[in-house]
């Protein structure tokens, strides 16, 4: 009978993949080969998802800022330009939070931007 040289390494590798595949349905969580395929696919999708999340949040912040800016009589692009010209350095995440949590403060920033543009 042939001698098995990689038994421990193979067992460790298989256990690691099957542990990652926990929660998958059917053979995807029970058998090594399908589990390995779908774990690799899941890890790839997770990597892609982390990049997409950043884009999605930026889009959400811009939509919120635009809605709040229009309620104050200025468009998003003019607001951002006015804030930049007036030297106000607030990022989009903070502006969107401000638009929701502190509408009065956001209105003051909108007035600052309008004044700088006029």
Swiss-Prot record:
Per UniProt, which keywords does this protein have?
Ribonucleoprotein, Ribosomal protein, RNA-binding, rRNA-binding
Any single biological process term in GO: ribosomal large subunit assembly
Q: Which GO terms describe its molecular function?
A: rRNA binding; structural constituent of ribosome
Coiled-coil residues: none
What does the entry list under GO cellular component? Answer: ribonucleoprotein complex; ribosome
Query: Which Gene3D superfamilies does UniProt cross-reference here?
Result: 6.10.160.10, Ribosomal protein L20
Which family, according to the similarity comment?
Belongs to the bacterial ribosomal protein bL20 family.
Free-text function comment from the UniProt entry: Binds directly to 23S ribosomal RNA and is necessary for the in vitro assembly process of the 50S ribosomal subunit. It is not involved in the protein synthesizing functions of that subunit.
In Swiss-Prot or TrEMBL terms, this protein is called Large ribosomal subunit protein bL20
From which lineage does this chain's organism come? Bacteria, Bacillati, Bacillota, Clostridia, Peptostreptococcales
């Amino acid at each position: 009978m042939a001698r098995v040289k990689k038994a421990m390494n193979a067992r460790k590798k298989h256990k690691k993949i099957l542990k990652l595949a926990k929660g998958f349905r059917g053979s995807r969580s029970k058998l090594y080969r399908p589990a390995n395929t779908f774990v690799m696919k899941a890890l790839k999708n997770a990597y892609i998802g982390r990049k997409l999340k950043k884009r999605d949040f930026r889009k959400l912040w811009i939509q919120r800022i635009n809605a709040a800016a229009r309620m104050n009589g200025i468009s998003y692009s003019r607001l951002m330009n006015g804030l930049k010209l007036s030297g106000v350095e607030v990022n989009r995440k903070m502006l969107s939070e401000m638009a929701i949590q502190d509408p009065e403060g956001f209105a003051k920033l909108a007035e600052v931007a309008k004044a700088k543009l006029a």
